[in-house]
């Protein structure tokens, strides 16, 4: 037993030695593994530090079913852990949780994956500890995902470090890892992603084909091409013109046709006149047609930015293609297609801007683009500024929502507010002013519209009034012969003639029977008056000119009849609440003349106290009654030769009481028959045309553009806003002189009526949801409710902002004024169609699922009907096909559509 015990003991000793050797081997292998892990960890950390990463992050790549790790696990720092535990509405990388996930497991959106990473890490550590304490056993390998590029580089660096450590050369490990990190850093990181949206390109091609088909047909002047063509011709010859809308659209077309060789010599005489062979008709209509083609993909993009599904966005673009009114309006030299494109793209960029991170490159680009596009919309037509107002509403609403975000500091909120002011107020103002700067720099010659502007503005232009006033005296003195012009509003000059007021008017009121004083709209010899000091008897300029100053009292003597300007307490003929103004005739009765007028210079802060020709704006106040000489705006009857009435109003502060001297000369007469030479002083004579600053020109032109729109006359095809939604009245654009072929502005009836119904459906659903949610009944998900509100803020409010203001506009309106509102109505229709599909899918389950199929089938049939109506009315959009009278009659679906037949025979 003892020997056996000794043997057993010897065996035990041998076994013990073997175990000790195994432990030593295990210890050495463990130390090697720790060194390898340390080397690999240092390599990866060094690589991350080289790339500028502050915290080590865990990246993953998602697959179709499960997500798998694509990089080795690294220990997280406390800052990383705190970042993980702080929720944020966006990913750590600033992307959206739905579309642009940062694919980072440190992001709070990937918390389930992070849990799986932690559990896998714990399992690996436990398996490593068990392998070190127990006899190693062979275990099957777990399936791992295919390695990414970063994994391959890290595994290669790890293998190199392991080979180094196994050979005992651990120092070289750092050299290899540094070289690998430098190689990875030196590798180019710039990538370009090219993606093509087939829906967008398909819509563009469809719109392009319909807009550019026979673009030069008809080769005649169509509707407002008469006016816009004249303006473009004036741009070619640098001649000043007046238009009630900003000039950007006309500038773009003028720039293009100048490149095409147009010289501006063609005279746009009347609608229907044939273009000359040298007029590039195609290039005249190119930019409107191109903008009309781009409108379809722009609407598609806007609907995508509003979070509609792709099929609904494509439906919106297709409806733009299939609407006849948008087709017609974009094929000729008209401004609406440019206006609609700029407004649509501006709102789309705004919606994307609101989702970008503050200060990022995308944030800056989208915000700047939105500001420029919305400003361009307003610089094409003033209605475009309503889109800018809509943008302001959306920005204010978004800022209001940001106030509830506790994660934003006060500084960040101020940055949000100030940046929006800069992008959506500063940029539009700069663009708008820049457009008019180009306008004034280009149009520096006098033209046919000069008389609308003030004398100072006219004198600043080459030719015209400048050629008359360039050598005339500057200061108004005793003995000056002047013409007094009504400065603001209607252009006319203070005028008198030998005719007198009737003894009694039609309303049985009596008059003074004195000589008439009127305001005449044309140059005439009876517009001349002589300035006279009351205490002097002569009417000549002395050797030392007696300059009239602010506050001086004068008399105005009519140059032809030699009678002085008078007023008294007698009611004016057309404005009884004001005093009559006349030239005094001495009938040898007790009523003496009241001939004294006080000169008040209104802009003396800039022009001085001396009365100057052209630039000084004066008010003439009657000394006896305190009433100011005023243009009343009323027209006299036949006894007054239909000239305009001039009165004296005790309410002195009024724009119509402002006058200025336009033509002026000094004369000295020895007797009343002969005029002597003019007495001119060099220091008082302008040597060149009057200088007017850019800001003075801009302010005056803006004022005139605002007032001029009120004087437009009615048109036989004008319409009222309440007639637009159901298209009660269209517009005849052009009629062929040889047949009944014509161009008539009408929309696609099916689209217009369905879109009007969509407005009512949305308003009804909004009221229904609001009441139900007040009762804590939630018929739609929170996500769908937010989309519903967003569509209302963008499309419903946009429609109302572009439509309701026309009810308060006192001017001639046409159907094409409704097109900006119609586009927003069409956008809202697309959302309503998608929302109804959502409601059916949500609430119709089981046997009711067939209702979804029925709805979609009905939608498809409706779309086919829209295409059929579009094709049916194409002859009225193109005007290229000759139609018989019967064919025209068949297209008259409403009695209010006034189509035109040959020989100007209208359908009644």
Swiss-Prot record:
Per the UniProt record, which EC number(s) apply here? 2.4.1.109
Q: Which PROSITE patterns match?
A: MIR (PS50919)
Write out the entry's keywords from A to Z: Developmental protein, Endoplasmic reticulum, Glycoprotein, Glycosyltransferase, Membrane, Repeat, Transferase, Transmembrane, Transmembrane helix
Which reaction is catalysed here?
a di-trans,poly-cis-dolichyl beta-D-mannosyl phosphate + L-seryl-[protein] = 3-O-(alpha-D-mannosyl)-L-seryl-[protein] + a di-trans,poly-cis-dolichyl phosphate + H(+); a di-trans,poly-cis-dolichyl beta-D-mannosyl phosphate + L-threonyl-[protein] = 3-O-(alpha-D-mannosyl)-L-threonyl-[protein] + a di-trans,poly-cis-dolichyl phosphate + H(+)
**Superkingdom of origin:** Eukaryota
Looking up Pfam families in the UniProt record yields: MIR, PMT, PMT_4TMC
* Pathways involved: Protein modification; protein glycosylation
Q: What is this protein called?
A: Protein O-mannosyltransferase 1
From what organism does this protein derive? Drosophila pseudoobscura pseudoobscura
Q: Gene for this protein?
A: rt
